[in-house]
Regions:
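Acidic, surface-exposed loops and disordered segments
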Residues: 1-169
Length: 169
């Protein structure tokens, strides 16, 4: 359906795995996070929570925990300056996981719509099951049964995407 801006945006978004050392503008981050909250949720509960990590120290700490969960000594966030971590709360609605995934999807698509590159990074659950991860949750004021669902890295790509997109459909 050529000519439809929403469809074109969905079809042209790519995962970016190399980032320039350049912060994302505040107004773009706010627009991305706001759009993410418009995802549909079970029973309209709107229970997922997003924590935006921009501090290099905290970002590097979460990246190290993620790399440890992966069993590699690498930066799983590919140098991205910001990470939006999406959490679901197990006690609010039975669809907490699906709801958090929809929020992450909205977040990634909103980033593309405002010209910010992104990538979905796994292992949020494993990171926030560790003692260090639970300490971060407490520091961020997230008490209760919050589960990490998605790390959405945000920034500006350092070069063209290597991912050509979907073919053969």
């Amino acid at each position: 359906m050529s000519g439809n801006a929403v469809i074109e945006s969905l079809e042209t978004r790519r995962a970016v795995r190399s980032y320039a050392d350049r912060p994302v503008e505040r107004e773009k981050l706010e627009a991305i996070l706001e759009a993410a909250t418009y995802a549909p949720t079970g029973m309209g509960a709107q229970s997922p929570v997003i924590v935006l990590v921009e501090s290099k120290e905290t970002r590097d700490k979460v990246a190290a925990l993620n790399a440890g969960a992966m069993g590699r000594d690498t930066d799983p966030f590919y140098g991205a300056p910001a990470v939006a971590i999406v959490f679901g709360h197990k006690d609010v609605v039975p669809t907490w996981f699906e709801d958090a995934c929809l929020v992450a999807g909205n977040l990634l698509n909103a980033a593309h719509a405002v010209g910010v590159d992104s990538c979905f990074i796994y292992r949020a659950k494993e990171v926030f099951e560790t003692d260090e991860g639970r300490a971060l949750l407490k520091e961020w004021g997230l008490d209760g049964d919050y589960v990490g669902v998605a790390n959405c890295i945000l920034g500006y790509g350092d070069g063209p995407s290597r991912n050509p997109g979907k073919t053969g459909t």
